[in-house]
Amino acid sequence: LQLLLYPMIDNLHATESGQIDNHPVWNQATSFAAWEMYLNGEPGKDASCYAAAARADDLSLLPPAHICVGTEDLFYDEDVDYARRLNAAGVPCELVVLPGLYHAGDVFHPQARVSQRLMASVKLALAQALGVADS
């Protein structure tokens, strides 16, 4: 199971949501800095699909996925597209879109309903993957 919480999978940030540059937690500037450190160089250069999953051409051999992302997250568009591509490749993928949630908002506001929904979906996906979910 790919259990992905607002994953950072595209080093190019070429989407509309990838242009978010005014959020104090995670924005385009902090993300480019993270990619630069991770890729040991320029964040905008082509990256291996092993480093940036969005660069992969063939997703058909990947395991099932559970992806959670908020509508106010820098990674929203790339995560939704990754889920679409997984499904198109025949890989079971559940996409949980969380209205109003920004990147790591669940960490800052764990009691918020949207945060609790995120954690409930994660717990259920993990329980199902391990075969211990209540019927």
Region roles according to the model:
Residues L1-S135:
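Alpha/beta-hydrolase superfamily serine-hydrolase fold, recognizing
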